[in-house]
Protein backbone atom coordinates (compact mmCIF):
# COMPACT_ATOMS: atom_id res chain seq x y z
CA UNK A 1 0.00 0.00 0.00
CA UNK A 2 1.72 3.11 -1.21
CA UNK A 3 1.20 6.79 -0.51
CA UNK A 4 2.49 7.75 -3.96
CA UNK A 5 0.78 7.43 -7.31
CA UNK A 6 3.60 5.78 -9.24
CA UNK A 7 2.73 2.80 -11.43
CA UNK A 8 4.66 -0.44 -11.04
CA UNK A 9 5.10 -3.78 -12.78
CA UNK A 10 1.73 -4.97 -11.49
CA UNK A 11 -0.24 -2.52 -13.69
CA UNK A 12 -2.78 -4.60 -15.65
CA UNK A 13 -2.60 -5.17 -19.40
CA UNK A 14 -6.15 -4.71 -20.62
CA UNK A 15 -5.32 -4.77 -24.36
CA UNK A 16 -6.97 -8.14 -25.02
CA UNK A 17 -10.49 -8.44 -23.60
CA UNK A 18 -12.79 -11.33 -24.62
CA UNK A 19 -16.08 -10.42 -26.26
CA UNK A 20 -19.48 -12.01 -25.62
CA UNK A 21 -22.11 -12.13 -28.37
CA UNK A 22 -25.79 -12.36 -27.41
CA UNK A 23 -28.87 -12.84 -29.56
CA UNK A 24 -31.58 -10.22 -29.07
CA UNK A 25 -34.87 -9.48 -30.80
CA UNK A 26 -32.98 -6.90 -32.84
CA UNK A 27 -30.18 -9.25 -33.82
CA UNK A 28 -26.75 -9.82 -32.32
CA UNK A 29 -25.21 -7.62 -29.67
CA UNK A 30 -21.61 -7.87 -28.49
CA UNK A 31 -20.18 -6.88 -25.11
CA UNK A 32 -16.71 -7.05 -23.66
CA UNK A 33 -16.74 -9.70 -20.93
CA UNK A 34 -16.52 -7.18 -18.08
CA UNK A 35 -19.48 -5.16 -19.35
CA UNK A 36 -21.51 -8.34 -19.64
CA UNK A 37 -20.65 -9.33 -16.07
CA UNK A 38 -21.57 -5.83 -14.90
CA UNK A 39 -25.13 -6.63 -16.02
CA UNK A 40 -25.02 -9.39 -13.38
CA UNK A 41 -23.80 -6.80 -10.81
CA UNK A 42 -20.25 -8.19 -10.84
CA UNK A 43 -17.29 -5.78 -10.66
CA UNK A 44 -13.62 -6.79 -10.99
CA UNK A 45 -10.86 -5.15 -8.96
CA UNK A 46 -7.73 -6.61 -10.53
CA UNK A 47 -4.17 -5.37 -10.57
CA UNK A 48 -2.71 -2.34 -8.86
CA UNK A 49 -5.14 0.01 -7.14
CA UNK A 50 -4.64 3.43 -8.74
CA UNK A 51 -6.73 6.48 -9.59
CA UNK A 52 -8.01 5.38 -13.00
CA UNK A 53 -9.09 1.98 -11.68
CA UNK A 54 -10.70 3.59 -8.63
CA UNK A 55 -12.70 5.98 -10.79
CA UNK A 56 -14.00 3.11 -12.92
CA UNK A 57 -14.95 0.98 -9.92
CA UNK A 58 -16.70 3.80 -8.05
CA UNK A 59 -18.60 4.74 -11.22
CA UNK A 60 -19.74 1.13 -11.66
CA UNK A 61 -20.92 0.91 -8.05
CA UNK A 62 -22.86 4.16 -8.34
CA UNK A 63 -24.43 2.98 -11.61
CA UNK A 64 -25.53 -0.32 -10.07
CA UNK A 65 -26.96 1.50 -7.06
CA UNK A 66 -29.00 3.72 -9.39
CA UNK A 67 -30.27 0.65 -11.25
CA UNK A 68 -31.34 -1.22 -8.12
CA UNK A 69 -30.50 0.09 -4.63
CA UNK A 70 -31.79 -3.09 -2.96
CA UNK A 71 -29.71 -5.69 -4.80
CA UNK A 72 -26.21 -6.76 -3.74
CA UNK A 73 -23.08 -5.86 -5.70
CA UNK A 74 -20.29 -8.44 -6.04
CA UNK A 75 -16.70 -7.16 -6.00
CA UNK A 76 -14.10 -9.74 -7.08
CA UNK A 77 -10.60 -8.82 -5.89
CA UNK A 78 -7.23 -9.99 -7.22
CA UNK A 79 -4.81 -7.22 -6.31
CA UNK A 80 -1.29 -6.71 -4.92
CA UNK A 81 -2.39 -3.37 -3.42
CA UNK A 82 -1.69 0.15 -4.56
CA UNK A 83 -2.25 3.81 -3.81
CA UNK A 84 -3.95 4.63 -0.51
CA UNK A 85 -6.00 7.60 -1.70
CA UNK A 86 -7.34 5.65 -4.67
CA UNK A 87 -8.25 2.73 -2.43
CA UNK A 88 -9.95 4.98 0.09
CA UNK A 89 -12.19 6.42 -2.63
CA UNK A 90 -13.37 2.87 -3.36
CA UNK A 91 -13.76 2.15 0.36
CA UNK A 92 -15.83 5.27 1.01
CA UNK A 93 -18.09 4.51 -1.95
CA UNK A 94 -18.64 0.95 -0.69
CA UNK A 95 -19.78 2.33 2.67
CA UNK A 96 -21.80 5.18 1.11
CA UNK A 97 -24.02 3.33 -1.35
CA UNK A 98 -27.20 1.58 -0.28
CA UNK A 99 -26.63 -1.93 -1.73
CA UNK A 100 -24.48 -4.36 0.23
CA UNK A 101 -21.11 -4.95 -1.43
CA UNK A 102 -20.07 -8.60 -1.21
CA UNK A 103 -16.30 -9.05 -1.60
CA UNK A 104 -14.63 -12.18 -2.98
CA UNK A 105 -10.85 -12.74 -3.03
CA UNK A 106 -9.49 -14.78 -5.92
CA UNK A 107 -5.73 -15.15 -6.24
CA UNK A 108 -4.49 -12.48 -3.85
CA UNK A 109 -5.69 -9.54 -1.83
CA UNK A 110 -2.65 -7.75 -0.47
CA UNK A 111 -2.22 -4.41 1.24
CA UNK A 112 -5.01 -2.11 -0.01
CA UNK A 113 -6.58 -5.15 -1.69
CA UNK A 114 -6.92 -6.82 1.72
CA UNK A 115 -8.30 -3.61 3.23
CA UNK A 116 -11.04 -3.47 0.58
CA UNK A 117 -11.73 -7.19 0.96
CA UNK A 118 -12.51 -6.83 4.65
CA UNK A 119 -14.58 -3.69 3.98
CA UNK A 120 -17.34 -5.73 2.34
CA UNK A 121 -20.73 -6.23 3.97
CA UNK A 122 -20.54 -8.33 7.14
CA UNK A 123 -21.42 -11.95 6.39
CA UNK A 124 -20.75 -11.43 2.67
CA UNK A 125 -16.94 -11.45 2.53
CA UNK A 126 -15.35 -14.53 1.00
CA UNK A 127 -12.07 -16.09 -0.12
CA UNK A 128 -11.58 -18.80 -2.71
CA UNK A 129 -9.68 -21.72 -1.15
CA UNK A 130 -6.20 -21.10 -2.60
CA UNK A 131 -6.21 -17.32 -2.39
CA UNK A 132 -3.73 -15.41 -0.23
CA UNK A 133 -4.24 -12.31 1.87
CA UNK A 134 -1.53 -9.96 3.13
CA UNK A 135 -1.86 -7.06 5.56
CA UNK A 136 0.76 -4.49 6.52
CA UNK A 137 1.21 -0.81 7.35
CA UNK A 138 1.22 1.89 4.64
CA UNK A 139 4.42 2.38 2.66
CA UNK A 140 5.98 5.82 2.24
CA UNK A 141 8.33 6.81 -0.54
CA UNK A 142 8.38 10.60 -0.52
CA UNK A 143 11.58 12.39 -1.49
CA UNK A 144 12.42 16.06 -1.19
CA UNK A 145 13.49 18.67 1.32
CA UNK A 146 13.75 17.62 4.96
CA UNK A 147 10.81 19.81 6.02
CA UNK A 148 8.57 18.34 3.31
CA UNK A 149 9.60 14.80 4.28
CA UNK A 150 8.63 15.59 7.88
CA UNK A 151 5.21 16.87 6.74
CA UNK A 152 4.58 13.74 4.69
CA UNK A 153 5.77 11.49 7.52
CA UNK A 154 3.21 13.05 9.87
CA UNK A 155 0.49 12.62 7.25
CA UNK A 156 1.26 8.95 6.62
CA UNK A 157 1.19 8.27 10.38
CA UNK A 158 -2.29 9.82 10.51
CA UNK A 159 -3.37 7.64 7.58
CA UNK A 160 -1.87 4.57 9.24
CA UNK A 161 -3.79 5.30 12.45
CA UNK A 162 -7.08 5.78 10.60
CA UNK A 163 -6.66 2.61 8.55
CA UNK A 164 -5.86 0.60 11.67
CA UNK A 165 -9.06 1.91 13.29
CA UNK A 166 -11.12 0.88 10.26
CA UNK A 167 -9.44 -2.53 10.06
CA UNK A 168 -10.22 -3.11 13.74
CA UNK A 169 -13.85 -2.16 13.13
CA UNK A 170 -14.28 -4.57 10.21
CA UNK A 171 -12.38 -7.52 11.71
CA UNK A 172 -13.51 -7.27 15.32
CA UNK A 173 -9.88 -7.24 16.46
CA UNK A 174 -8.60 -4.75 19.00
CA UNK A 175 -6.68 -1.74 17.75
CA UNK A 176 -3.59 -3.01 19.57
CA UNK A 177 -3.77 -6.35 17.72
CA UNK A 178 -4.12 -4.63 14.35
CA UNK A 179 -1.18 -2.32 15.08
CA UNK A 180 0.98 -5.27 16.09
CA UNK A 181 -0.02 -7.53 13.19
CA UNK A 182 0.43 -4.89 10.49
CA UNK A 183 3.85 -3.75 11.71
CA UNK A 184 5.41 -6.07 9.10
CA UNK A 185 3.99 -8.03 6.15
CA UNK A 186 1.61 -10.70 7.44
CA UNK A 187 0.43 -13.36 4.99
CA UNK A 188 -2.69 -15.44 5.60
CA UNK A 189 -4.28 -18.39 3.85
CA UNK A 190 -8.01 -18.36 3.12
CA UNK A 191 -8.78 -20.25 6.33
CA UNK A 192 -6.48 -18.00 8.36
CA UNK A 193 -8.21 -14.94 6.88
CA UNK A 194 -11.53 -16.32 8.17
CA UNK A 195 -10.04 -16.95 11.61
CA UNK A 196 -8.59 -13.42 11.69
CA UNK A 197 -11.92 -11.84 10.76
CA UNK A 198 -10.86 -10.44 7.39
CA UNK A 199 -13.50 -12.55 5.64
CA UNK A 200 -16.50 -14.56 6.77
CA UNK A 201 -16.06 -17.87 4.96
CA UNK A 202 -14.23 -19.77 2.21
CA UNK A 203 -16.01 -20.51 -1.07
CA UNK A 204 -15.12 -23.90 -2.55
CA UNK A 205 -17.84 -24.16 -5.19
CA UNK A 206 -21.21 -22.62 -6.01
CA UNK A 207 -24.34 -24.12 -4.48
From Swiss-Prot:
One of its GO terms (biological process) is protein quality control for misfolded or incompletely synthesized proteins. It is an enzyme of class 3 (hydrolase). The keyword Protein biosynthesis does not apply. It holds the Pfam family CLP_protease. GO terms for molecular function: ATP-dependent peptidase activity; ATPase binding; serine-type endopeptidase activity. Keywords: Cytoplasm, Hydrolase, Protease, Serine protease. Coiled coil: none annotated. It catalyses: Hydrolysis of proteins to small peptides in the presence of ATP and magnesium. alpha-casein is the usual test substrate. In the absence of ATP, only oligopeptides shorter than five residues are hydrolyzed (such as succinyl-Leu-Tyr-|-NHMec, and Leu-Tyr-Leu-|-Tyr-Trp, in which cleavage of the -Tyr-|-Leu- and -Tyr-|-Trp bonds also occurs). Its EC number is 3.4.21.92. Its main location: cytoplasm. The active site is at 111 (nucleophile), 136. It is found in: Cytoplasm. GO terms for cellular component: cytoplasm; endopeptidase Clp complex. Gene3D superfamilies: 2-enoyl-CoA Hydratase, Chain A, domain 1. Belongs to the peptidase S14 family. HAMAP family: ClpP. Cleaves peptides in various proteins in a process that requires ATP hydrolysis. Has a chymotrypsin-like activity. Plays a major role in the degradation of misfolded proteins. Fourteen ClpP subunits assemble into 2 heptameric rings which stack back to back to give a disk-like structure with a central cavity, resembling the structure of eukaryotic proteasomes. This is ATP-dependent Clp protease proteolytic subunit. The gene is clpP.
Amino acid sequence: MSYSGERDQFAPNMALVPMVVEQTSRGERSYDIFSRLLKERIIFLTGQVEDHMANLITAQMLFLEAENPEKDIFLYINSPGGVITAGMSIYDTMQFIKPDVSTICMGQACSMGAFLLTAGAKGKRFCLPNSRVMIHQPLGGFQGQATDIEIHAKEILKVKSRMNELMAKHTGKSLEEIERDTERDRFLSADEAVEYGLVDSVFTRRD
